[in-house]
Amino acid sequence: ILHCYGSHFSYHQRYPREFARFLPDDDVAIAAKHRDKLLNAYDNSVLYTDHFLARTIEYLRGMSDTRSALLYCADHGEDLIDDERERFLHASPTTTAWQLHVAGLAWFSDAYRREFPGKAEAALRNAAAPATTHAMFHTMADIASIRGGEYLRTSVSLVSDDFDRTAPRCYLNDHNEAVPYPRSGLR
């Protein structure tokens, strides 16, 4: 398990200078008039995360006979002064779609696919399914073929044909309260 600090403000501090592809990227001022710099720095941090994940996959791929998998999911999205509300960061009192819609990635080695073809195929079938980060625990345990009685549920695993696409989804608001999603008016 790897934990990436990822794309958290101040974004320009989240990547080496050689990944400063989008310029200018000095995101020290939070204001609509500096949005281009914020976006550039944020995009550079995403570019670096992509590089990190690609290098990790290449490392795993180099262990050709090893059953390995990589599962990545951002813990939250960011508001980047995206509309007239001029919201910035995350965990605002009124959550936005920008904060909740995040990237995810699953990769499986050839050896893993040979050993567990159904799990890799289920991951493809569930790739566009609505899910929350709550599914990560169950998915990781299922990838590792860990069974745990009542605590591990394949209905919450993205590598299972039992994954329940219709299950209610919730997110935590700024008071750490579970709120059903989708919610009317969320944009």
Language model segments and positions:
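Catalytic domains that recognize anionic headgroups
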Residues: I1-R187
